Amino acid sequence: MTGYTPDEKLRLQQLRELRRRWLKDQELSPREPVLPPQKMGPMEKFWNKFLENKSPWRKMVHGVYKKSIFVFTHVLVPVWIIHYYMKYHVSEKPYGIVEKKSRIFPGDTILETGEVIPPMKEFPDQHH
């Protein structure tokens, strides 16, 4: 037996038609894609309304606003972060870093005064 049976031919024809329809459905119409409307925040709404009138001073005010936001976020905030880190984590000034003082033993010399710590007295009758 050679060739396809009538059922197989019908199935192949239906699959080809389904594939043609699917490919045709993938083509976008001129009005697609439909994008959802953008939600604007309160500041963006304000600036859009403010800039509707195209006067030069309004554009200058908006430019100054944009530059000040840039300076605040890219200069001041990083400088504050670096200052905080340097002040509380790196500096050796008094109270900059609080750390535990090292132990002092008999015979040690105190650097600031040059004083030598005397040996401890022995108390033979007390048991600690």
From Swiss-Prot:
- Residues where N-acetylthreonine occurs? 2
Q: Which residues form a coiled coil?
A: none
Short name of any one Pfam family annotated for the protein: NDUF_B6
The record lists the membrane-crossing segments as: 68-86
Q: Assembly and interactions?
A: Complex I is composed of 45 different subunits.
The Gene Ontology terms for molecular function here are: NADH dehydrogenase (ubiquinone) activity
Membrane topology, as annotated, equals:
Single-pass membrane protein
Q: Which InterPro entries does the record associate with it?
A: NADH_DH_b-subcmplx_su6
**Which GO terms of type biological process are on file?**
aerobic respiration; mitochondrial ATP synthesis coupled electron transport; mitochondrial electron transport, NADH to ubiquinone; proton motive force-driven mitochondrial ATP synthesis
* Protein name per the record: NADH dehydrogenase [ubiquinone] 1 beta subcomplex subunit 6
